Amino acid sequence: MAAEDGAKIAAQRIGSGNPVIGKEKAEAGRCRECHGADGNSSDAKIPNHAGQYAAYLVKQLSDFQSGARRHEIMTIMAEDLSAADMADIGAYFADREIMQGDGAGANGLGRNLFDNGDRGRDIPACASCHGTRGKGGIAGNVIYPVIGGQRKIYLRSQLVGWKLGDRKNSPDGVMNKIAESLSDDEIEALADYISGL
């Protein structure tokens, strides 16, 4: 059963796109210039995409295209992509080796919030959606991104964006509700912990 679940999760990670064609499209579309040749960015402000769920990447590209998510450069990069382009590019990055953390993942406050949340403030455990160690792996739960090992500065900026309402494209606004309840110190602790996973 565990092997079946692993195969199912691997298939869900890639989705319906073609990773071989996606590589060609990602290279032609200049994705590698910012997100790295293997989907791991060398710029701390730019997210890693290696090992990310294709469905999540497709949603983000669609949101940039529609204006549901705003970013000056990514809006331009996504504007001419077809649904097939997005699926193929998503499959390519999903098929890359999953991003690895560069920190120790030892922040106690961050770990507690990640593993347990805070019921008194209606903050669910991050792991309940993002999986153990933030690497996904929850069958059928492909719209919540892999966050373990993501860039600390990027993680912090996204949590702050959700808290302030600058980013609003999470399903049912769940990330806005969670981030609004976090203190600046908790955001810093979570970014530090998650980046080290």
Feature locations, PLM:
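Electrostatic cytochrome c docking/interface patches
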Residues: 1-27, 42-43, 95-122
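The feature marks the first
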Residues: 8-66
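The canonical Cys-X-X-Cys-His
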Residues: 29-38, 89, 123-132, 190
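Sequence context surrounding c-type heme c attachment/ligation sites in exported
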Residues: 23-32, 51-54, 115-127, 148-157, ...
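Axial heme c-ligation environment in periplasmic c-type cytochrome domains
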Residues: 42-48, 63-105, 140-145, 163-197
